[in-house]
Amino acid sequence: MSNFLTVGFWFCERLYHSLVMVKKRSDCTIYQITVMNGDLEKLLYGNHRIYEMNGCLNVEACENEDQQILKLNIAEALSKLLRIPLKNVRQSGGS
């Protein structure tokens, strides 16, 4: 069963919004992100999932630094909204 959330997040000093589809599976919960901005949606393309495992949100490292910063900003907002800890993976020197 899928539910939907709306999440506001900051990126480059501007507030944006995303639609998040929540898919619960037996082994994890998947948060599939759609950014409500065409340019940012293109930036996130191919790397738009955040996984909740073992009670934490996990964000995989991205090759593109801007994509990593965007995904982490969305994940941080989602973490605050859901009150689920975020596993910190800021490996590319993000903001």
For each feature predicted by the language model, list its residue ranges:
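Short, cysteine-centered beta-strand-loop-beta hairpins and adjacent loop/turn segments enriched
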Residues: 14-16, 39-44
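Acidic, low-complexity intrinsically disordered segments
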Residues: 41-95
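Residue-level recognition of conserved beta-strand positions in structured domain cores
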Residues: 20, 33-35, 61
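Short, surface-exposed, low-complexity cationic segments
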Residues: 24-37
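A generic structural signal for beta-strand entry/edge sites
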Residues: 4, 28-30, 54-58
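Negatively charged, low-complexity tracts enriched in Asp/Glu with abundant Ser/Thr
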Residues: 1-26
